[in-house]
């Protein structure tokens, strides 16, 4: 059984978020939370919040035991880009792309659910 949580349009570049997601992918939920608390990156608190939401979804919606859960999937996709301009010399301007992320975390207890035909 799986439970999932998504945070959309987070104002951190996906490349930076993926660095932290790589640390928790495949880990036990408790271990992943401990790693996030000690990781000194801007995306850590946001990812921790999404992970806690996924755990709460698992417990509330599917009656799963949160102690047995493992981070099955953790990925960051690119969200909408905010385009800004920086004035440069001689009347020119250069583009600044402020990138956003969609963060998705899926937790699983390792048990397969019965599929209906």
Curated annotation (Swiss-Prot):
Q: Which residues form a coiled coil?
A: none
Q: Which Pfam families does the UniProt record give?
A: Ribosomal_L22
The record's similarity note reads: Belongs to the universal ribosomal protein uL22 family.
What the entry lists under PANTHER family is as follows: CHLOROPLAST 50S RIBOSOMAL PROTEIN L22-RELATED (PTHR13501), LARGE RIBOSOMAL SUBUNIT PROTEIN UL22M (PTHR13501:SF8)
Report what the protein is called. Answer: Large ribosomal subunit protein uL22
Lineage, broadest ranks: Bacteria, Bacillati, Bacillota, Bacilli, Bacillales
Which species is listed as the source? Staphylococcus epidermidis (strain ATCC 35984 / DSM 28319 / BCRC 17069 / CCUG 31568 / BM 3577 / RP62A)
Q: How does it assemble?
A: Part of the 50S ribosomal subunit.
Signal sequence bounds: none
């Amino acid at each position: 059984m799986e439970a999932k949580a998504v945070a959309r349009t987070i104002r951190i570049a996906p490349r930076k978020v993926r660095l932290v997601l790589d640390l928790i992918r495949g880990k036990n939920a408790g271990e992943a939370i401990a790693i996030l608390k000690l990781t000194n990156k801007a995306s850590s608190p946001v990812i921790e919040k999404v992970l806690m939401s996924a755990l709460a979804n698992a417990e509330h919606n599917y009656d799963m035991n949160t102690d047995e859960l493992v981070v099955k999937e953790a990925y960051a996709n690119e969200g909408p880009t905010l385009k800004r301009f920086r004035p440069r010399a001689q009347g020119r301007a250069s583009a600044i792309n402020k990138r956003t992320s969609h963060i998705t975390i899926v937790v699983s207890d390792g048990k397969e659910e019965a599929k209906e035909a």
